[in-house]
């Protein structure tokens, strides 16, 4: 029985599936989260800075250092200065790796305007005219401007008596343990590694939970799955080969068999999505 993958266990099973199919038991993997950090321009949050979730107790460490700038940012915080009659303030923005061009958001001040009223007008103008960015006013009357799509980064600039004082920068983070559960949106919001000028952190999307060591049953099923597709079409063989790689958690293979492009896939093309992977 130790030579039959259907009955072998533990080390014997590992040796057999590696011998017959080149498969290795999948090891535990940490959880992964995308974070949004907000801080003062010029401040750097070091790599491996910790953030946590008070609901789950899980702790994540940033995967790389983050410096707050008004370029390659997901958003900015604006401070409106002293206002004079007929002064003009404007906010310009662009998306990285996009050909789209957007007109600047421009405000011309009136006789009764104050810094607060101009800030409110700027927020209203952004929210009523732009489908790309949104804005809100905080308790200090600073204007927060962010791309609506959290995956978008871009460059921001201002003219007139309005300054960029903070920015939002995205970063990925990895759990400190292999037992972290899914972190619901906005629940990773505690800064555990304080940095002067780093004010906020949150996760715009649910995280990806940790995975456990692959069990004998899971390894055996993956072995049977890989063998069942060896003699089938390219799409199935590709799926099997990718899913067998160490660290891979999810595979999706979409094929377009038509003569014309369809849903972003070229004619007779294949689009592959893979989550995880150590190779």
Briefly describe each language-model feature range.
Residues 1-279:
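Short beta-strand/helix segments in adaptor/scaffold domains that form protein-protein interfaces
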